Amino acid sequence: IPKKIAFVQCVGSRDEKAGNLYCSRVCCMYATKEAQLIKEHNPDAEITIFYVDIRAFGKGFEEFYRRAEKEFNIKYVKGRVAEILETPAKNLIIRAENINSGELIEEEVDMVILSAGLVPAATEEIKKTLKIPVGDDGFFVTAHPKIDPVTTSLKGIFTAGVAEGPKDIPDSVAQASAAAMKASIILKG
């Protein structure tokens, strides 16, 4: 059972080199939740989360993150991981910079969990068949991301969930309800 565990946030997102400039919106809270679950099952585990910025979208998420720090002793380090190396003993060495202190960190851990950014799942075939425009980020474009995030440029075609952009499950369910309502209006004529 791994005792020292590190989470690395924003892998492949918020990164110009990777081509994904957007935040996936869910990774910080998922990592925090997983870290808490690990601590519940293994209280002696030492967990470090390396992050760029903690993004706590949603009601109660900021408190959830603070609770992880205080009650579960989960360590958060602001900084990008530069390198992960394997030791002869098959452990991993993480090299990173703590942005807040300027300190270079080299930490040996038993396990590294990468929080990879969300990417659009729409295949080229779906895009060509439906002829719905996609943005530079690859997600479907809607009438307006805040006012009307489900209506596409094609009458009767609606998006929901991560098809339109990164979001969590409650936001996806709410958006799916809105899309279903708009579709039912068309069907009722």
Which sequence ranges carry the predicted segments?
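Residues forming the flavin
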Residues: 1-189
